[in-house]
Amino acid sequence: MNVLVINSGSSSIKYQLIDMEREVPLCSGLVERIGEPMGKLTHKIRPDAEGEEKLTFEQPFTNHVEGMKRVVELITDADKGVIKDKSEIGAIGHRVLLGGEEIKQSVRIDDWAKGVIRDYIPLGPLHNPANLAGIEVAEELFPGLPNVGVFDTEFHQSMPAKAYLYPLPIELYEELKIRRYGFHGTSHRYITKRTAQYLGKPLDELNIITCHLGNGCSMAAVKNGKCVDTTMGITPLEGLMMGTRCGDIDPAIVPFLMEKKNLSPAEADTLMNKQSGLKGMCGMNDMRDLHAARENGNERAQLAFEMFTYRIKKYIGAYYAVLGRVDAVVFTAGIGENDDFVRAEVCAGLDSLGIAVDPARNAVRNGQPRHISPDGSRVAVLVVPTNEELEIAQATLDVLKG
């Protein structure tokens, strides 16, 4: 079966059509700047494979429906298409940010599921409305085709109350559902399953610390194959220092800044989400630019690098304590998979925990799951490339199979 995976943003649609018999993407792409005077569509045929072909188009897209119609035209094009017509698509899997406590696993989209997504718009004001728009577009363009929602928060629903509750008045949780939800769950779940396969260990016996490090960063403590804690909270702002997000700070800083800088709640939110993290410390949110600046003696870039890796190291220690026994520390996503400097610095000084990195292995980049720890290490340190689209497609099939 071919599964179309959709990740709908407020002004974008990211998509991938996957042949699930071979687990190979037939095409992928991104529609950008929806609603602006001029939009852009980047479409790849046979992505990440020999003979990959990239097509780029610039045209206005008034709304998500227009953008998705153009995608369907490309997928089924007589010359460049990868399928003959829409009937060769068996199901659609949607990435959805927040399903709250009501949705603990991937679900077939119906009125109830859409209602839950709407109910959590106050906690996911940017993503949930956009995700819902993507679902409604798919329902319009592919009538009768099953749509499945795969939620970023699913994997973390196994956390115990002691991990997900905040020490605020309990009435605020009961009334407003203020609690830790966690995000990047689709990636953490994929990495957990892939690590079990790679190590040849039963999933229900696997204890690992997963480190999803990209422009957004999160970690998870996984015990017996299930998440027991994660760094992101009620929003993706909590936890690690990120590209533009501050991560953990003293909450009293927020009202202090609002008073001293005369900031509105929205302005304070923008400061913490868009102007902080690596960008706030040194003006750069791309780790590659930061490394170049460090090499040229930029002290703020060096400090930002040290802060970034220090906070990851702290959470490794905390999650080691939570798990008691750790089979592996696993790095994934853009920085986690490709940045040997970050991995080396994070693991430096953790020998007493059985965590160490072999410099030669750490320098290898081959796109495959691999050890970067020395032979005989008590804890394996791994690089495992993530594949959220494949995980969404697999979850979609699992729901349809019942």
Curated annotation (Swiss-Prot):
Keywords (A to Z) from UniProt: ATP-binding, Cytoplasm, Kinase, Magnesium, Metal-binding, Nucleotide-binding, Transferase
GO cellular component, one term: cytoplasm
Keyword Ubl conjugation: no
Active site: D152 (proton donor/acceptor)
Location(s) in or outside the cell: Cytoplasm
Binding positions (substrate): R95
Site location (Transition state stabilizer): H184, R245
Top-level class of the enzyme under EC nomenclature: transferase
Pathway stated in the Swiss-Prot or TrEMBL entry: Metabolic intermediate biosynthesis; acetyl-CoA biosynthesis; acetyl-CoA from acetate: step 1/2
Protein name according to UniProt: Acetate kinase
EC number(s) on file: 2.7.2.1
